[in-house]
Amino acid sequence: MSVCIRCIKTDIMKIFCVGRNYAEHAKELGNAIPDEPVIFMKPKSALLQSHTPFYYPEFTNELHYECELVLRVSKNGKYIQENFASKYYDAVTVGIDFTARDIQNELKEKGLPWEKAKAWDNSAVIGKWVMLSGVKNKKDINFCLYKNKELVQQGSSTLMINSFDNVVSYISNYFSVNIGDLVFTGTPAGVGECVVGDELEGFMEDDSMFLMDIK
């Protein structure tokens, strides 16, 4: 796939995240495959740009990586029809939805929200942006994550339960989408633990999107 990489400067507004958007990932965590997108959010303070130091949070003993494709919203909208949704985002990258898995499991057992497990500072990593105008087929974007030079996760937009357009349309039924919003579109199977000293590198096709060390 040929891509055109360029820097995009924008103010981040909201960070939307989609859970259980790959069937195999839902199965590996023992979750049912949902009938509709599972949406949660992170605050702006969760954002961590590529090449910025990441420090292991002191409140968890089980930090997991979840590698995902991330969309950048380029147009304001509400109640967007799915067949027009592609007009509302213009760039894609690879990111990580860091999760304090031990805390998330405790919260899930109690039926409580996930914010303490997923929405803390620097829990939403993003790499460099790729303009979708340079992507030949956005329905077939391959991405992967390496931990310490070893492949640990790989996925493709073809394997998503809910497509980019479906996700953006669905979100807009409940929230306004605004220029600068981000959409983490879900993680494939292969999530796992990371520790201090690990190196994580995310790729889209053959291009490195981010490289980071856990300190």
Predicted regions and their residues:
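Switch II (G3) loop of P-loop NTPases
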Residues: 187
